[in-house]
Amino acid sequence: MKKRVALAQTLIMDPEILLMDEPFSALDVQTRQLMENELLELWSADRKSVVFITHDLEEAIALSDRVVVLSAGPATHPIGEYTIDLPRPRDVAEIRLTPHFVELHREIWHRMKDEVMKGYVQSQAR
């Protein structure tokens, strides 16, 4: 409920660009999917720009029109950009079951996997 209130409070301000940094990370899977669908509905009403930061590749694909993959830190930079050409409106649970979603996931994960391992090694060295 707190996430819904926070999202509503942000949208009331009617920002030109909405920056969301891991907004649903603390939620269980079912609540997360409800919130993701709610975000898509709200977005479709006025189509403002949303910069959505997430470590969840499935979430990125399900919500986005474009995914930008960043390198492992500390000098993070873009290493790939992918157009997400899935039909709208979308249901985040249903879209994940489509062959094109799976294809996009496979393509992006193939590019990301080395960076994920670099990040893992960096975190273990600390």
Where are these predicted regions, by residue range?
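Conserved ABC ATPase nucleotide-binding domain "signature" region
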Residues: M1-R4
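Hydrophobic anchor residue at the start of the ABC signature
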Residues: L7
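Conserved catalytic segment of ABC-fold P-loop ATPases
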Residues: A62-V69
